[in-house]
Amino acid sequence: MDEPGGKIEFSPAFMQIEGQFGKGAVMRAGDKPGINDPDVKSTGSLGLDGALGQGGLPRGRVVEIYGPESSGKTTLTLKAIASAQAEGATPAFTDAEHALDPGFASKLGVNVKRLLISQPDTGEQALEIADMLFRSGAVDVIVKDSVAALTPKAEIEGEMGDSHQGLHARLMSQALRNKTANISRWNKLVIFKKQIRMKMGVYGRPETTTGGNALKFYASVRLDIRRMGAMKKSATKSYDWSTRVKVVKNKVAPPFRQAELAIYYGEGIYRGSEPVDLGVKLENVEKSGGWYSYPGRRIGQGKANARQYLRVKPEFPGIFEQGIRGAMAAPHPLGFGERRDVQQESGEPYGNNG
């Protein structure tokens, strides 16, 4: 970009733009803060952090998490909040559904005394409160639960049975047009939870998400979370379930990767076997017969003993996880699934990654 005989920073056009619009109105892409060291927040799952490509959910971006009921959306967002708190961040939770249970959140590791909660009356109020919190610098992460519950004021003040066609979609479109630039400027992370609806009388997959198409376009990361099946703890009762999360859109890393999570009731995402399983998939841990080995030492015979080794060696898990994250940061890490027929499985075509 250098001009002959000098740098563009000293050209009359560049100086005029900065004088009129302020410093930073035009800059080199490589000079933007965080361009080489992305700022991310962990999801609370080592496997999902790897599937996302950069080690977590990117700050300064909008993230959408959608899926059927009881698929683990709330559990995933609360674990992300707990991870953010562990890193010193201050999160906020917009409880538009008025359904958050502080006791359940506490069991998942959330420090409820440090969690800001808002229960707005209207969708406009919810979005304005979030914007004011961002401007104050008081919070780093905001979760909006959920898009379907961000009810427009006109609908609340109207009569039951009144038609408000397109009102919700217009609210989301206007809000994202106005707020996305501020989210990037203030380097905040916004997570929208979305429910799934069924379109009537359509050919093919009838699933769709609420709130129109605006969030699909403005979100940098979209996660499709689906419950796969129950995992039994006893012969008669099922307490836990396995969940698959697909990255159907990703503007900061390669998309279409996936991770499988084990979710325990009252505990959240179970990380006990994640490091060992991922280490084997990423070829960072050697499995020979029944023995698991990490470079330089054996960590156990059988997966249970390997997990126990990580549990009783206080200095080792950090080194072990650091090695796993380093392997996940490779350009083409193994073990996170390939480009599958995302259009058929999640309802999102390949071309919707823009």
UniProtKB/Swiss-Prot annotation:
The keyword Cytoplasm applies. It is found in: Cytoplasm. One of its GO terms (cellular component) is cytosol. One of its GO terms (molecular function) is damaged DNA binding. GO terms for biological process: DNA recombination; DNA repair; SOS response. Residues 28-52, 332-354 are annotated as: Disordered. InterPro entries: AAA+_ATPase, DNA_recomb/repair_RecA, DNA_recomb/repair_RecA_CS, P-loop_NTPase, RecA-like_C, RecA-like_N, RecA_ATP-bd, RecA_C_sf. Pfam families: RecA, RecA_C. Keywords: ATP-binding, Cytoplasm, DNA damage, DNA recombination, DNA repair, DNA-binding, Nucleotide-binding, SOS response. HAMAP family: RecA. Can catalyze the hydrolysis of ATP in the presence of single-stranded DNA, the ATP-dependent uptake of single-stranded DNA by duplex DNA, and the ATP-dependent hybridization of homologous single-stranded DNAs. It interacts with LexA causing its activation and leading to its autocatalytic cleavage. PANTHER family: MITOCHONDRIAL DNA REPAIR PROTEIN RECA HOMOLOG-RELATED, RECA. This is Protein RecA. It comes from Acidocella facilis. The lineage of its organism: Bacteria, Pseudomonadati, Pseudomonadota, Alphaproteobacteria, Acetobacterales. The gene is recA.
